[in-house]
């Protein structure tokens, strides 16, 4: 039989349905893989072998009774920013090191309804703030393609576990590129859905107007199958859009002849490596060969301001969202003083890591009385201009094509001393969050043995369009089938 850890969701489902494979066998194979590789990859914060095997047994019983859905019995992992009832949810922070939520996130319930098997929770940058997973308070995740390199962030553990075949799929969150950038660095498929497409209920908030939950998978078909399970309206999330989600897997069929694709010039900036740009040009050639028309002269002039806008708006929202961690209600509490104000101050000083404290201070400054108009209000105005530019572009184009990142996976420790250099890793992904658009990163080749990602951007709620283009690309190439030697 095919190596079980190499199977996609679709392949696993077929074998499970035909009773040629059991979920228990599939789950045990992935737990064995985790046990073997975790000392080197360090993708998981928490592994749940007993409950995973129990869920697999239940899935096998359901299949025996003829009750099987596309994700029934499929082993998966969750970024440790999604609440899981009875399983600790740390956000890779000392502040929540021992926090066990009393409820599940909406997407966790949806996957449970499907019968998916939860292997464990994955490592991340603390409170989803970072681009390398080095900001985890506990340990750094390593890139499966080169363990001296970072896997990207903040969802580095979720990307690495799929790339290393420790899970068939995983979920992450994306605030400024935290699904797409690690998907690029780890050579997997990663989708940031349209804002409001997937409920954020039970997602520990970083920046509420930017956060979105999405999948990491081995290919676009698997991505569509996961989206079929998690997308849709949820009245517990005020930003969830009240509309019926499409059948994403059925949208993949058909060619892309006649599709109009735009290539924004601003995404090939001075900090873009020439060899990455060359790989993207090769990918554009593939899309052109599939019948799409490619316009390389698109301009989105406000793109250079997106990074500054993001680092005003996101920290401002984080400053408000993280004010709840005061040591009083839950989480870490400094209890070596009887003075309440000192206890709160010490709780936050000791519970939060350096990057989280940096962003809280930036956000608090931007929201302060003397600077609110000069910084926060102005950033919101520029956000509107960026969104309008995208809207204008989508009147002419079906999708926009860019690199996912301007750089290759970098060495662990290389950028930690320079926060600005780290922030620059997300220049191609941040504008999409600012505008609330869907975007997908898919493997597009390698440079010096390290992965390069292709980003496909769509207009709001045209997630199925970008997935169709991505699927067509994967049908014409084999980059997504490459796996690291571990």
From Swiss-Prot:
Which GO terms fall under biological process for this protein? translation
Cellular component aspect of the GO annotation: glutamyl-tRNA(Gln) amidotransferase complex
Q: Which reaction equation describes what this protein catalyses?
A: L-glutamyl-tRNA(Gln) + L-glutamine + ATP + H2O = L-glutaminyl-tRNA(Gln) + L-glutamate + ADP + phosphate + H(+)
What are the EC numbers?
6.3.5.7
A UniProt-annotated Pfam family? Amidase
Q: Which GO terms describe its molecular function?
A: ATP binding; glutaminyl-tRNA synthase (glutamine-hydrolyzing) activity
> Any keyword Nucleotide-binding?
yes
- InterPro entries attached to this UniProt entry: Amidase, Amidase_CS, Amidase_dom, AS_sf, GatA
Residues of the active site are 79, 154, 178
Q: Which UniProt keywords apply?
A: ATP-binding, Ligase, Nucleotide-binding, Protein biosynthesis
Q: Which family does it belong to?
A: Belongs to the amidase family. GatA subfamily.
HAMAP family reported for this sequence: GatA (MF_00120)
| Annotated NCBIfam families | gatA
Assembly, per entry: Heterotrimer of A, B and C subunits.
Biological role stated in the UniProt entry: Allows the formation of correctly charged Gln-tRNA(Gln) through the transamidation of misacylated Glu-tRNA(Gln) in organisms which lack glutaminyl-tRNA synthetase. The reaction takes place in the presence of glutamine and ATP through an activated gamma-phospho-Glu-tRNA(Gln).
Q: What is this protein called?
A: Glutamyl-tRNA(Gln) amidotransferase subunit A
Q: Which organism is it from?
A: Dehalococcoides mccartyi (strain ATCC BAA-2266 / KCTC 15142 / 195) (Dehalococcoides ethenogenes (strain 195))
| Gene designation per UniProt | gatA
């Amino acid at each position: 039989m095919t190596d079980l850890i190499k199977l996609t969701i679709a392949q696993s489902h077929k074998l499970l349905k035909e009773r040629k494979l059991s979920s228990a066998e599939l789950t045990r194979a992935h737990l064995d893989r985790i046990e073997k590789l975790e000392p080197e990859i360090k993708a998981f914060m928490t592994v749940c072998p007993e409950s995973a095997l129990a869920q697999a047994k239940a899935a096998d019983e359901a299949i025996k009774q003829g009750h099987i859905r596309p994700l029934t019995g499929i082993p998966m992992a969750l970024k440790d920013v999604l609440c899981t009832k009875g399983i600790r949810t740390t956000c890779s922070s000392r502040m929540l090191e021992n926090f066990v939520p009393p409820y599940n996130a909406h997407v966790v319930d949806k996957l449970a309804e499907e019968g998916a098997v939860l292997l464990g929770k994955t490592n991340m940058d603390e409170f989803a703030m970072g681009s390398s997973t080095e900001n985890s308070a506990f340990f750094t995740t390593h890139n499966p393609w080169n363990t001296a390199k970072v896997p990207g962030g903040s969802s580095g553990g979720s990307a690495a576990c799929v790339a290393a075949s420790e899970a068939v799929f995983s979920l992450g969150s994306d605030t400024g590129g935290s699904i797409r950038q690690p998907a690029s660095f780890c050579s997997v498929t990663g989708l940031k859905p349209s804002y409001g497409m997937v409920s954020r209920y039970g997602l520990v908030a970083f920046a509420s107007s930017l956060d979105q939950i999405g999948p990491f998978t081995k290919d676009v078909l698997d991505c569509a199958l996961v989206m079929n399970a998690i997308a849709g309206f949820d009245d517990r999330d005020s930003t969830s859009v009240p509309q019926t989600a499409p059948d994403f897997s059925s949208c993949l069929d058909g060619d892309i002849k006649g599709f109009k694709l735009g290539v924004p010039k601003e995404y090939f900036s001075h900090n873009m490596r020439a060899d990455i740009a060359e790989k993207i040009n090769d990918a554009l050639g593939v899309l052109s060969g599939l019948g799409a028309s490619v316009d390389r002269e698109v301009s989105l002039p406000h793109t250079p301001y997106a990074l500054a806008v993001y680092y005003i708006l996101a920290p401002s929202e984080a400053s408000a969202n993280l004010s709840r961690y005061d040591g009083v209600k839950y989480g870490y509490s400094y209890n070596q003083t009887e003075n309440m104000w000192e206890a709160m101050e010490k709780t936050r000083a000791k519970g939060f890591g350096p990057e989280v404290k940096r962003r809280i201070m930036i956000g608090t400054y931007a929201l302060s009385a003397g600077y609110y108009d000069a910084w926060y209000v102005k950033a919101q105005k520029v956000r509107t201009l960026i969104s309008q530019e995208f809207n204008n572009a989508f009147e002419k184009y079906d999708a926009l094509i860019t690199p996912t990142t301007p750089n290759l996976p970098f060495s662990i420790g290389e950028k930690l001393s320079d926060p600005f250099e780290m922030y620059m890793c997300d220049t191609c992904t941040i504008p999409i969050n600012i505008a609330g658009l869907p975007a997908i990163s898919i493997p597009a080749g390698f440079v010096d043995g390290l992965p390069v990602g292709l980003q496909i951007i769509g207009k709001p709620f045209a997630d199925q369009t970008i997935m169709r283009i991505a699927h067509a690309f994967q049908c014409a190439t084999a980059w997504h089938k490459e796996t690291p030697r571990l």
